[in-house]
A protein has these predicted regions:
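Active-site metal-binding core of divalent-cation-utilizing nuclease and nuclease-like domains
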Residues: 6, 13-17, 30-72, 85-92, ...
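Short internal beta-strands
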Residues: 107-111
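Nuclease catalytic cores
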Residues: 16-24
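Domain-level recognition of nuclease-like catalytic cores that cleave nucleotide substrates
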Residues: 112-152
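Charged, often low-complexity linker/regulatory segments
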Residues: 1-9
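Active-site-adjacent loop/helix micro-motif of nuclease/hydrolase catalytic cores
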Residues: 78-93, 117
Length: 152
């Protein structure tokens, strides 16, 4: 994604240990320029809610939050940092994107390397291997047209 490429020098995990909100803040202007609605804070009005379930008269009864959402492109972006692999956050992102109404594409941005307690963890490689395993095994069909994993 061009948004992360444009911000690479400011967000690369080789030099920085930004939290996910810090990474999102760096790429938000580029995503917004592409037509994405982007989370700008932690208050309810600043979050991006994507419908999951509806009740009578089309009112949303359940929605999940995303870091960025492009309605016309049917695209959701999630930016993760330290807990992407350690806490299986990327799996939660996958599940929620699969439940979202009218979303065909998911991009998950994770650190290339996450350092915890002095140990380097290859988060990007682990997430990619996980998704490759899902697709290669052909045992689980995901209701998405595409998943993009971006390392930073």
């Amino acid at each position: 994604m061009n948004a992360l490429d444009a911000s690479h020098v400011d967000i690369t995990s080789a030099k920085h240990a930004l939290p996910s909100d810090g990474v999102l803040a760096c790429v938000a202007p580029y995503l917004a320029e592409l037509g994405f609605a982007v989370e700008i804070g932690k208050k309810t009005a600043e979050k991006i809610r994507v419908p999951v379930l509806y009740r009578n008269n089309g009112r949303v009864s359940k929605a999940f939050e995303a870091d960025a959402h492009h309605v016309e492109g049917k695209f959701v972006v999630e930016v993760e940092a330290g807990r992407a692999v350690a806490n299986n956050q990327f799996l939660k992102d996958l599940f929620q994107a699969c439940m979202m109404d009218d979303v065909d594409h998911l991009a998950i941005a994770v650190r290339n390397v996450y350092v915890a307690a002095g140990v380097k963890n290859p988060d990007f490689d682990r997430v990619v291997t996980f998704f490759e395993t899902i697709y290669a095994s052909n045992r689980m069909r995901l209701p998405r047209r595409g998943i993009l994993v971006i390392g930073y």
